[in-house]
Amino acid sequence: MSSEKLRLKVLEVVQETGDAHSIVFEKPSGVSYKPGQFLTLRLPHVDGPVARCYSLSSSPYTDDHLKVTVKRVKDGRGSNWVCDEVLQGHELDVLAPSGTFTPKSLDTDLLLLAGGSGITPVMSIVKSSLAKGTGRMLLVYANRDEQSVIFHQELREMVAEHPYRLVVLHWLETVQGLPSRKPLQEIVRPWAHAEAFICGPAPFMDCAADALKELGVSRDRIHVERFTSLEGDPWTEVEAVAPEPGGKTVDLVVELDGETHELDWPADQKLLDFLLDKGLDAPYSCRQGDCSACACKLLEGEVTMLNNNVLEKEDLAEGWILACQSLPVSDVVKVSYDA
């Protein structure tokens, strides 16, 4: 996990489907990531640079380079530029990998539900589990038609190589109609014990999550990744609000990258700003509450968030908070980026 700003060279551009491209970046030494995480790219635009988060479809266990896969969005300011303009040899500004849409263990059974470009982080998880894990996987992959299926051949080859560990079921709108709750339930019922990961268009994710909840799958085993467009520019220095001299502080314990830090946290300074001021390499991207790059888990105490456009009520119930928007409420707070 890192907020490090990188300048990455494009090694290859692969056209996956008529409206989806993969961008393969050179991977600098020292950069690591987990399956299911994303990169934040800085892209030019007539109205000024825009930042977009694109999931990694590469695996840290099987791929030497970083690869993101981008599908065109109608009138999308970022996706269309990537698909039309990025060429081999270009260099782009990128924030180091981050995100929490990643399995705690690759040895557990996984239920993967993807729609359209939602296959991107799921592909990273599939490849990683097959390479380093022992768990079995069911992937339900929904698309408009067969021509829209990203990674069609690669998925077919992985199933052929690992028939007892990976099952892939395609749901095509032109054949079966839009995914609906009851048919999905019947498909995934035998996998209700597994850790579930859902990514795709909002209606698909809501349908899939509702189907799992009605089957009795506990919320802590349902992981959802929502694609959002960022409004700010993470490369622009944000003027953090300095704490009032002599103001109230609270006892803060932070678990980050395997280390524990005990600090006096000013009550009027946001958690992320404070950690960065202290020289800690806490992850972040938008700094506006619009993405989950800075998410950490509240283990003890209470905070208030000034803005939250990404965490759902179930996430909040589990203790997830956005460090970029959190102020302390209780006198003692403990958070973990490693949970």
Where are these predicted regions, by residue range?
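Short, surface-exposed secondary-structure boundary micro-motifs
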Residues: 44, 97-98, 338
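C-terminal accessory/binding modules appended to enzymatic or scaffolding proteins
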Residues: 247-287
